[in-house]
Regions:
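N-terminal acidic leader/helix
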Residues: 1-22
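Short, charged, amphipathic alpha-helical segments
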Residues: 6, 28-37
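A structural signal for well-ordered alpha-helices, especially hydrophobic packing surfaces
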Residues: 12, 16-19, 38, 42-45, ...
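Membrane-interface helix-loop junctions in multi-pass transporters/channels
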Residues: 54-56
Length: 56
């Protein structure tokens, strides 16, 4: 579970950095990377939900 949390934190950091670059600098490549990161976060959150339910 701890490794999953680390993956989520890393992916969120990537999302935040790239989304900020898109908004502040208009960096289109950063927009693509931020959308990819948000998609990966969605998958990780679903995995988190499944793992946390099993842990209860």
């Amino acid at each position: 579970m701890e490794e999953l949390i680390k993956k989520i934190e890393a992916e969120f950091t990537s999302f935040k950095q790239n989304a900020t670059q898109l908004v502040n600098k208009g960096n289109k490549a950063a927009g693509v990377r931020s959308r990819r990161a948000s998609s990966n976060l969605d998958k990780l959150f679903k995995e988190w939900r499944a793992v946390s339910v099993k842990a209860e």
